[in-house]
Amino acid sequence: MKKNIILLVAMSLTLSGCGIYTKYKPATSVPDDLYGGEVVTEDTAGLGNMDWRELFTDPHLQSLIETGLRTNTDYQSAQLRVEEAQAVLMSAKLAFLPAFALSPQGTVSSFDTNKATQGYSLPVTASWELDVFGRMRNSKKQAKALYAQSEDYRQAVRTQLIAGIANTYYTLLMLDEQLIISRQTEEAWKETVASTRSLMNAGLANESAVSQMEATYYQVQGSVLDLQQQINQVENSLALLLAETPRNYERGTLADQQFPTDFAVGIPVRMLAARPDVRSAERTLEAAFYGTNAARSAFYPSITLSGSAGWTNSVGSMILNPVSYTHLTLPTNREV
């Protein structure tokens, strides 16, 4: 038995250099001539570090964004993915602890007219897997990377949702302004047509001029209807983001919008590294790396320490005769 244990320990030390225990290291080296000039490496308050409430100050837009963060189905799904990954990570951490099983049993027997005999037992078994070849360690690191990836994915969905609601809202404001101008133009052309018709009745204009003015007036009327249809379509898109029935959304005007003027763009490399979709892709690669290590570890033996203990009484209901037993096994099975 001692020889087997020593052999397994020596084997684990030998196989430690086979990539099972290696740590994920992202590639960070870049060519020296990648950038044309030097840049200031001081940290700056970039646009990506601003809270969305500081960027979008319109109260109507803020209300729509808050509603979207509560009701959007894609964002809710991303939040559930985070909870799922958190549970998987907790399960991977608990795999390092011993496992216990309790299975109480009881029997009642009677022969002829004798008094009934009661028997009961309370066995307890425990097992503990030794992570010699790093299977559980790599599985935990993989679960940790997937948990971080789910957090980054949730942040990416959140960013896309906020940007989508804001873009749709400002599109509505732009269409509102165009509709106001088109209606003013419609009224102006209506008066022009009436004036031209009066001139024709006075003999100062012909019918061709009136027809030309009317054609332009009807064209402006058609543009008003097109803008109203576009507004309805954009409101339907906004309702889809908010997961609610389409309606007429209360909103401000384009002239009342205010945006912060004092903010730095930031360093492009840092802005790229701060993007949640980029971080999510990096975490996915890290999880695949540790998943590969865990798969390699499955080719080596798994060592499990197991033991059992129990208390039993099978003599009679008035006599206690506890018997305890415990044993230790060291199986070595090769998992393929």
Label the model's feature ranges.
Residues 2-16:
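Sec-dependent bacterial lipoprotein signal peptides
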Residues 14-20, 195:
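Hydrophobic membrane-targeting signal helices
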Residues 18-36, 66-131, 163, 233-249, ...:
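A small-residue-enriched
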Residues 35-44:
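N-terminal targeting signals for Sec/Tat export/insertion, comprising classic cleavable signal peptides
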